[in-house]
Amino acid sequence: MDGLGRLEYRGYDSAGVALVGPGGLNVVKAAGKLDELRAALSARPPAPATCGIGHTRWATHGGPTTANAHPHRAGNLAVVHNGIIENFRPLRAEVEAAGCELLSDTDTEVVAQILDLDFTARLKAAGEALSQEAVAAVLVESMRAVTARLEGAFALLAITPLAPGVIVAARRSSPLVIGLGEGENFLGSDVAAFVAFTKRAAEVGDDQVLLLTDEDVTVWDADGAVVQPATWEVSWDASAAVKGGYETFMDKEIHEQPTAVGDTLLGRVDEAGDLILDEMHIDASVLRSVDKIIVVACGTAAYAGHVAKYAIEHWCRIPV
């Protein structure tokens, strides 16, 4: 919860955690702020856990509801995901054809179901009781196979009570960082999530898959070869976490503008170069009929509006 709290500055509309321990897999989610999740955890205290995953979600596919919040559970797996899966519609049709019941409108639940189908099939093909280490290895293979089918940007984490104490993850384009501690290890979209516990971090590259335990981290490339991730020491402390290591919020916002533009466009530009804005629920014909734009803002947002005015009028030929 502390780690999720340090990522609040990014904005979100729901949150949740999944925990694995002797009692099995426990998922708790809530729409709204982290206080809502804390209340849900207080009302239903989870059993002691050996590992867990958590997520603060900003709605893309599906509205800001508890059902759409992460983690999503599918069979013996719980999954969190940061990013946008561009081909989730055909994957959703595949999942539904397989008889899976979907409880949300999200692309993440579709991925969780696809991953569980592959994971279950591989376990069944093994035909015998597997050790926890063998189960973890199967989940790594499933993660590699499934992420190879995904189009878009993602950082995916999965846990299972069949291999408690293990997190399997993969990334493409979306950020994912390893925190290397003493008798504990971490994963986060930003070092701010774990800098209070360790300042030693490692980089996860594109299309890499990893297996993390409290004592070890193993990373593979897309071809299944073990790689050694680059490591570094974080030079700032937890008090600076919300500022991303910058001296001021202004510095942070200035330097993050290119990343912010890229994140905004993730999954929203198709192969033809057209923008996809499904969550706005506005027909393209309506957008084409817009003949004037009014920017309402104050403070630094007003300055951004003044800059946007020149860009919009230049490229869209619409008065602002």
What residue spans do the PLM features occupy?
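Conserved short alpha-helical segments that host acidic/polar catalytic motifs at enzyme active sites
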Residues: 1-243, 247-248, 256-294
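Glycine-rich phosphate-binding loops that contact phosphosugars or nucleotide phosphates
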Residues: 288-320
